[in-house]
Amino acid sequence: MTEKQFPVHCWLSRMWDTEAQIEQKIGYRDKLNSWGVGQYDAEHVSSRTGENTSETKYLEYTVLSEEIEKKITEYLYQNRRTEAVIGNVTNNLYRNILFDWYINHKKWNELCRTYNYGKSQLYSIRQKALDAVARSSRKVKQRKTTSSFR
């Protein structure tokens, strides 16, 4: 599995665990199709032949980002990360995966040309992910506060 096919694995393994641990915890090899990653790759290739519209590609990208976001959040909760880690490291993690990887590796111009949308829409996707992290962090803090009164 290459970084181009699934960048999240590369980032996660660098930040936390070995490749085997990531495979075990997230199970990405078994879930590629359910995440839409395999479909995304295939349709991205077919889009060069003109079979897909830019709207379809934009939707694929958005759905893929949301699925990655969801799986990483699940990973953090399953491993019972502390509230500080979920609040701080997760923000950096999403920034790396959902923003910097696409921007720095695929470059702004290529992204805008491929998906036919501008920088403001890419920033919007990034902000949506970061907002989700903030909501997750607040939920964890509320749970900790509630349990301390029991």
Stretches with model-predicted labels:
Residues 1-88, 135-150:
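N-terminal interaction/assembly modules
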